[in-house]
Curated annotation (Swiss-Prot):
Reaction(s) this enzyme catalyzes, per UniProt: UDP-N-acetyl-alpha-D-muramate + L-alanine + ATP = UDP-N-acetyl-alpha-D-muramoyl-L-alanine + ADP + phosphate + H(+)
InterPro entries: Mur-like_cat_sf, Mur_ligase_C, Mur_ligase_C_dom_sf, Mur_ligase_cen, Mur_ligase_N, MurCDEF_pg_biosynth, UDP-N-AcMur_Ala_ligase_MurC
Pathway connected to this protein: Cell wall biogenesis; peptidoglycan biosynthesis
Subcellular location: Cytoplasm
Domain of life: Bacteria
Organism field: Actinobacillus pleuropneumoniae serotype 5b (strain L20)
Binding sites annotated in the UniProt record for ATP: G125, T126, H127, G128, K129, T130, T131
UniProt GO MF annotations: ATP binding; UDP-N-acetylmuramate-L-alanine ligase activity
Name recorded for this polypeptide: UDP-N-acetylmuramate--L-alanine ligase
């Protein structure tokens, strides 16, 4: 016990009275990362989730006590309870914790406590934050700085989404979906872009969302640094309000770290970054798309400003294998009508879907793009309906799955049938609605052609479905 208390006192001095930490929704990407870091710091970790999966199994094998299902008795012995943003006050574990006077906090509040005693680098934005966080983490690792990192998705090069390092550096994805990133007080903040999403959090008011980002950036100390995308109109609009040092990056001629001469061949991207001092750095990436060049340049800017050598930056970016479910190639397969490539991608916002399609078009100009799209949440489908119609009309063939509700009740006019109808009326592509995913393989075999690139797109169960499809095609 003495060794445990000494360790806690050293790493997180103010949490020395905390022994057991319970996570409700421990299987989620963001929650599991923090749980894993704290488990490795020596805390007793327990947690619950509605279903067993690879993440819960891994945590259990590492020493966490994992419950499947939410029950009041699961919080017994906890010093504090960390609740996922998907968990509300009606959850039996939340109710039991409050009745027992156990503190119930958000994920970001726990992340903030871990960051408090470290040199924090927080990455926020509507799109690209998971990949950018992963890239920064790998650069610092390549530079032998042994950072702690907590990411919202798998860092493929590391084989995990979180790591407890021995240095003072903590690199973390910052979550704007519930505005909980306001708890964080980093030394460096990155904002990749700002677009309307999760608008229920902001009362449907985009101005409120922008103001919240400004508050997040003002959490930087006066000597901190904001690294912001020059290509995003909203990001540039709020930059003068930050009141901290700001450096920009992007394709824009006004960017401090400027991208030039981008070229893509298959999965590989080449470009040059012109730095504020005029230095020119040639970058090689093995992940496709201009959006990944932006992510990599944000990571490069952070690393350069913190004094990391070019050799480490370029080696890490060249070796970067991507983040989980970001243009993730599942394989090439021989089907009755020819050979096809299957790719899984997490993008579920129109902008994310758009850049994925563009990456596919740029790297594989002669291939048809066949998309399997699963809308994520009725509210997002409603709020961005017209944008989805325009973006999804860019593909050569479209299979639409039913909306992945993520706990939401259906909204009239915001379902997959309505999307299909509006896309069909636009006249560019004739979507096929597949309500029974067991029939997906059969439907695909009827429409695919030799050389097709098939994109399985969305944040819900479409990844599991597409990976099951890949396994069946291997047989």
């Amino acid at each position: 016990m003495k060794n445990f208390q000494d360790k806690i006192k050293k790493l997180v001095p103010e949490m020395r009275r905390v022994n057991q930490i319970h996570f409700i929704g421990i299987g989620g990407a963001g929650m599991s990362g923090i749980a894993e870091v704290l488990l490795n710091e020596g805390y007793q970790i327990s947690g619950s989730d509605i279903a067993e999966g690879p993440v819960t199994k891994r945590l259990a094998e590492a020493g966490a006590k994992v419950f499947i299902g939410h029950q009041a008795e699961n919080v017994a012995g906890a010093s504090v309870v960390v609740a996922s943003s998907a968990i509300d006050d009606s959850n039996p574990e939340v109710r039991a914790a409050k009745e027992a006077r156990i503190p119930v906090i958000q994920r970001a509040q726990m992340l903030a406590e871990i960051m408090r005693f470290r040199h924090g680098i927080a990455v926020a934005g509507t799109h690209g934050k998971t990949t950018t966080t992963a890239m920064i983490s790998m650069i610092y690792t390549e530079a032998k700085l042994d950072p702690t990192f907590v990411n919202g998705g798998l860092v493929k090069s590391a084989g995990k989404n979180a790591h407890l390092g021995a240095s003072r550096y903590l690199i973390a994805e910052a979550d704007e979906s519930d505005a909980s990133f306001l708890h964080l007080q980093p030394m460096v903040s990155v904002v990749t872009n700002i677009e309307p999403d999760h608008m229920d959090t902001y009362g449907g008011d985009f101005e409120q969302m922008k103001a919240t980002y400004v508050k997040f950036l003002r959490n930087l100390p006066f000597y901190g640094l904001a690294v912001m995308c020059a290509d995003d109109e909203t990001v540039i609009e709020i930059a003068p309000q930050v009141g901290r040092q700001v450096l920009t990056y992007g394709f824009s001629e006004k960017a401090d770290y400027r991208i030039e001469d981008y070229q893509q061949t298959g999965f590989q991207g080449h470009y040059t970054v012109v730095c504020p001092n005029g230095e020119r750095i040639d970058v090689l990436l093995n992940v496709p798309g201009k959006h990944n060049a932006l992510n990599a340049t944000a990571a490069l800017a952070v690393a350069k400003e913190e004094g990391i050598a070019n050799e480490a930056i370029l080696a890490a970016l060249a070796d970067f294998q991507g983040a989980g479910r970001r243009f993730d190639q599942l394989g090439s397969f021989i089907r009755p009508n020819g050979k096809v490539m299957l790719v899984d991608d997490y993008g579920h916002h129109p902008t994310e879907v758009d850049v994925t399609i563009k990456a596919a078009r740029s790297g594989w100009e002669n291939k048809r793009v066949v998309m399997i799209f699963q809308p994520h949440r009725y509210s997002r489908t409603r709020d961005l309906f017209d944008d989805f119609v325009q973006v999804l009309s860019q593909v050569d063939a479209l299979i639409m799955l039913e909306v992945y509700a993520a706990g939401e009740a259906p909204i009239v006019g915001a379902d997959s049938k309505a999307l299909c109808r509006s896309i069909r009326n636009l006249g560019k592509v004739d979507p096929i609605l597949v309500s029974d995913t067991d029939q997906l393989g059969e439907v695909l075999d009827q429409i695919i052609q030799d050389g097709d690139l098939i994109l399985a797109q969305g944040a819900g169960s479409v990844s599991r479905i597409s990976r099951g499809l890949a396994e069946s095609w291997k047989a």
